Each structure stands twice: as structure tokens, then as C-alpha cells.
């Protein structure tokens, strides 16, 4: 008996259904008792029947109140709300605590009812516009007082002037803000005789407080003067100096500081999209993998993952905030940009010329795009090539370009250790005075006619030295070039443009001249041996 009463109490606490009552449970129990008594008097004929215990009775499903075949509308009376904040004035609208009527519609009936209500609202709105136009016409846009205009009402506007039958009501918005006079009229029509006037002042204070956002601090927050710190809230920075103007290092708010980080948001978005796309690819490739395993599936997924990571990094780089960019720029200026410029120039074959040239595409296929700079680079650049004489005869349009005319070229290799330059016949050391004197330059002077273009057809011939040709650079130079053989090993230049293809006027072919000191070159010098665009 105790177990029976306990189970009954448990059902009352578990079942929240309003429709269930004690009589239903009593009926169920009485029917089950009668069934048990019948079974005891008349034993079942089938042996498979097993009586179920009342303690393991399944919980009844709650009846759902949501139905998708009909719409139930509850109607409430209007009251002064005290819960909403209008954009102006007081007398906020609300509704009563209990509804006064209920009505059910089918889906089609509700759609028709909504259309009728919308057309009626639209008709009233057009009447108000028509009445306002008549008043403005009588008062000449408000410049003249008119007694007739003051006496006009909505009843003076005929319904024949308003046609809303052929208007598509879905193109209009019907939840429009109401002015204060209209709200007060609706409240009086609903039976509200006394409207609280103090609500107007409260709503005004709320609107003023909402206009003030953040603190007025600039770069530095004093906890005793900061409005956010006095209110016990964190300073918030959505963008530069908005709404709080404090900086990251100058904020003294004891509650803390929150800064919107677009990089973090973008990173989270890209990671989420990446995970979803990888999961979808795995689901698509899973049936194919069960039938026939693919050896390159894992590598393709790894490649896709790396592509997503690269895209993520690229997107993050473009989302740097202004404050972070300024900080990075200051750090770069403090550390010095000469080293980064030198390292970037060492990885490129740079050709410096005094005049802009139209370089053909077949000049040097080894380089993706020849770089032509009309300026001087700081010390540490790899190879500098420019014309010594700025006075060149103008090349005709049909002849070869101006950079292939006769004229000496100078190749420089800037090194960290002192190197004696090549001396001319006059005994004076050659070298441009415009470069700094901390680093000596190794100079090789060649005529322009000794250079040939690195065409695709000549790439095989350029990679092999010709048999019987001397490897010395001076034998390829003209006799009037004025260069002398270095007397000692110390005077011999440590770098020669061996990878630069050239030819003399009396040679038919061209070959790459390998210097004797190629074995002594460092890895840095060997990396610089690229065909240069001249």
C-alpha cells in the first residue's frame, strides 16, 4: 500500500500536464485492478503473456499545445507600459496582465485576416498623409495661419480618394513608431483615465544615459576620474578611441579593459569554416575510401589543411588594427631597416641602370621579372650593375636597344672584408665615389657588346664551358680595356661574374666562364650567381 501511494505521488510531481486529473488516474487504476482480477479468475490461454509491474509503468507523454494547422490569437487591453523606452516623449504603451479574448484561425483565415488589417492600417496612414497635405496647402507650408486648416479631421478625407485595393501590402512596414499624442489617445480609448506624468522624466533620463557611452579619458584613465571605473564596469574599445579613448598601456581602470580584436574574430571564423569543410570532405570521401582505399587521400587532406592555414594567415595580415600597425612600424624603425633591406636584396638579382629600359621577355629566363631600379642601394647589396658613361648615342627604333650599345659596364660585389680593387694603367684605383668607403668594391669592366641575351635556345650552351677556351676573364676583354693582371694573390678579386654569359666580337658562340676561385666561394656568393637583366 505504501508503494502504491508513493508511485501516485511521484506521478503528480512528474506530470505537468494540466489536463491530467486524479479521476483519470483513478480510472486507470480501477481498470487495471479489474483486469488483474479478471486475469486471476480466468487465467490466460497464451503462455507468452507476462503481467507488467505498476512500478515500471511508462511515463505518459505530455500533450503538446503547439499545432501547425491553426493559429491562436490572444487579445490584450492596452495599458501604460512602464517597460519600453520611446524615442521621444512619455506615455509608453503596454498591455494588461491577462488577455480578454481568444480566437483561433486556420492558416488561410489568419493570412486573410492579416491582409485585411494591413489594408485598414494602410488606409488610415494614407488618410493622415492626405490630411497633412491639405493643411500644408491651406497654410502655405505653415507660413500662414488658417482656421479652416485647424478644423480639419480624418473624417473630412473621403474614402474615395484613398484606393488600397490594388496595393501590395507586403511592400509596406506596419510597425511604425507612434507619436506621443497618438499613444495618449490610444491609452484613453482603452480606458486608461489617469496617465502617470512622472514616467516622462524617467524616460528622458534613460535616453540621456544611453547617449553617453564609454568614458571621456584620452590615452590615460585615472581610476578616480574615469566614469567606467567609478561605475565598476570595464572600459570598452571597439575601434580607435571609441567608445573609450584610453590606450592599452594607459588604462588605469580597476575593473579592466576590453578591446575588440578583429584578428581573433576572423581567425575563429576561418578555423570554424576550415573544420566544417574538412569534415564535409571526409564525409564525402568516406564511402569511396570504404570501396577502394586511396594512397594520396591523406596527402591531399594535408595539402588542403596547409592551404587553409595560408589563407588564414593572409586574411589575418590584412586585418591589423591601426594601433598594432603603428606599434609594428615603431619597432621596425627602432631596430633599423637596413639589415632587412640588405637581406631582401641579396635574394634578388638587382640591376641598377641610369635610364629606364624596355627589357624584352627573352633577355633572362632565369629571373621571373628583372628588377630595374634607378637609384643607389645601401651597403650590403649583392650585385650592382650600371653604366659608367651616361652619354650614349641614341638607338634607332629598328636597331638594338640602348643597353646593348657599346659602352663599358661595371660589375660590383660588395663584401664585408677589405679587397683591393682592380687598378687601371694610370695606377689610380677605380671605384665610384658615391658608395660608402667602409666596404671596398671588386670591379670588373666589360664592354656592352660582350653581353648576350639568355635565350631559351642558348641555355644548354651556356651551361657548358667550351673546350679550349681560357677561363681567364682578361682574355675575353678587349685589348684597349686597360686592365692589368693582379700581381699578387691578394689583389685578385674574390668574385667574378662567371654566371653571366658574354661573348666577344671575334667569337661565334658563347660559353660560361668559370673562375678558378669557384671552389673558394661561400654559399652566399654561389647563391648570388643569377643571370642579371642589363
Swiss-Prot record:
Highest expression detected in thymus, brain and ovary. Low levels detected in naive T-cells. One of its GO terms (cellular component) is nucleus. It comes from the Eukaryota. GO terms for molecular function: DNA-binding transcription activator activity, RNA polymerase II-specific; DNA-binding transcription factor activity; phosphatase binding; sequence-specific DNA binding. Keywords: Acetylation, Activator, Apoptosis, DNA-binding, Nucleus, Transcription, Transcription regulation. Residues 42-52 have a biased composition (Polar residues). It is found in: Nucleus. Binds to the consensus sequence 5'-AGAGTG-3' and has transcriptional activator activity. May play a role in apoptosis. Belongs to the AXUD1 family. This is Cysteine/serine-rich nuclear protein 2. It comes from Mus musculus (Mouse). The lineage of its organism: Eukaryota, Metazoa, Chordata, Craniata, Vertebrata.
Amino acid at each position: 500500500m505504501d508503494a502504491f501511494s508513493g508511485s501516485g505521488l511521484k506521478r503528480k510531481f512528474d506530470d505537468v500536464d494540466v489536463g491530467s486529473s486524479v479521476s483519470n488516474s483513478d480510472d486507470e487504476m480501477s481498470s487495471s485492478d479489474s483486469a488483474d482480477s479478471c486475469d486471476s479468475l480466468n487465467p490466460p490461454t497464451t503462455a507468452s503473456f507476462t503481467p507488467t509491474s505498476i512500478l515500471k509503468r511508462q511515463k505518459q507523454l505530455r500533450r503538446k499545445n503547439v499545432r501547425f494547422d491553426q493559429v491562436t490569437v490572444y487579445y490584450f487591453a492596452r495599458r501604460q507600459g512602464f517597460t519600453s523606452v520611446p524615442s521621444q516623449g512619455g506615455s509608453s504603451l503596454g498591455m494588461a496582465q491577462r488577455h480578454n479574448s481568444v480566437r483561433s484561425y486556420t492558416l488561410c483565415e489568419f493570412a486573410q485576416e492579416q491582409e485585411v488589417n494591413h489594408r485598414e492600417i494602410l488606409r488610415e496612414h494614407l488618410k493622415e498623409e492626405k490630411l497633412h497635405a491639405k493643411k500644408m496647402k491651406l497654410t502655405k507650408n505653415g507660413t500662414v495661419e488658417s482656421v479652416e486648416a485647424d478644423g480639419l479631421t480624418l473624417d473630412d478625407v473621403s474614402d474615395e480618394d484613398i484606393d488600397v485595393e490594388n496595393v501590395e501590402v507586403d511592400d509596406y512596414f506596419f510597425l511604425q513608431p507612434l507619436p506621443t499624442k497618438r499613444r495618449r489617445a490610444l491609452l484613453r480609448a482603452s480606458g486608461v483615465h489617469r496617465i502617470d506624468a512622472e514616467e516622462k522624466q524617467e524616460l528622458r533620463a534613460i535616453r540621456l544615459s544611453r547617449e553617453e557611452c564609454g568614458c571621456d579619458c584620452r590615452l590615460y584613465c585615472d581610476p578616480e576620474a574615469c566614469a567606467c571605473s567609478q561605475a565598476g564596469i570595464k572600459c570598452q574599445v571597439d575601434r580607435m578611441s571609441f567608445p573609450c579613448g584610453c590606450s592599452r598601456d594607459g588604462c588605469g581602470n580597476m575593473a579592466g579593459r576590453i578591446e575588440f580584436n578583429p584578428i581573433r574574430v576572423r581567425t575563429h571564423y576561418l578555423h570554424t569554416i576550415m573544420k566544417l569543410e574538412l569534415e564535409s570532405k571526409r564525409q564525402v570521401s568516406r564511402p569511396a575510401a570504404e570501396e577502394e582505399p586511396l594512397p594520396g587521400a591523406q596527402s591531399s587532406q594535408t595539402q588542403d589543411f596547409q592551404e587553409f592555414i595560408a589563407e588564414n594567415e593572409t586574411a589575418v595580415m590584412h586585418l591589423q588594427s591601426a594601433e598594432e600597425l603603428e606599434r609594428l612600424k615603431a619597432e621596425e624603425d627602432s631596430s633599423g631597416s637596413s639589415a632587412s633591406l640588405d637581406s631582401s636584396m641579396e635574394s634578388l638579382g638587382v640591376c641598377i641602370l641610369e635610364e629606364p629600359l624596355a627589357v624584352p621577355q627573352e633577355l633572362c629566363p632565369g629571373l621571373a621579372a628583372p628588377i630595374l631600379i634607378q637609384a643607389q642601394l645601401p651597403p650590403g647589396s649583392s650585385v650592382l650593375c650600371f653604366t659608367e658613361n651616361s652619354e650614349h648615342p641614341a638607338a634607332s627604333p629598328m636597331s638594338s636597344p640602348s643597353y646593348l650599345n657599346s659602352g663599358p659596364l661595371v660589375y660590383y660585389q660588395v663584401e664585408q672584408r677589405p679587397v683591393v680593387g682592380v687598378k687601371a694603367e694610370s695606377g689610380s684605383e677605380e671605384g665610384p665615389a658615391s658608395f660608402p668607403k667602409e666596404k671596398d668594391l671588386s670591379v670588373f669592366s666589360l664592354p656592352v657588346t660582350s653581353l648576350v641575351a639568355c635565350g631559351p635556345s642558348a641555355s644548354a650552351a651556356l651551361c657548358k664551358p667550351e673546350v679550349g677556351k681560357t677561363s681567364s676573364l682578361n682574355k675575353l676583354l678587349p685589348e684597349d680595356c686597360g686592365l692589368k693582371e693582379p700581381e699578387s694573390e691578394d689583389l685578385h678579386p674574390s668574385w667574378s661574374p662567371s654566371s653571366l654569359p658574354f661573348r666577344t666580337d671575334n667569337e661565334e658562340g658563347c660559353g660560361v666562364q668559370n673562375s678558378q676561385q669557384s671552389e673558394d666561394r661561400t654559399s652566399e656568393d654561389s647563391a648570388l650567381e643569377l643571370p642579371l637583366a642589363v
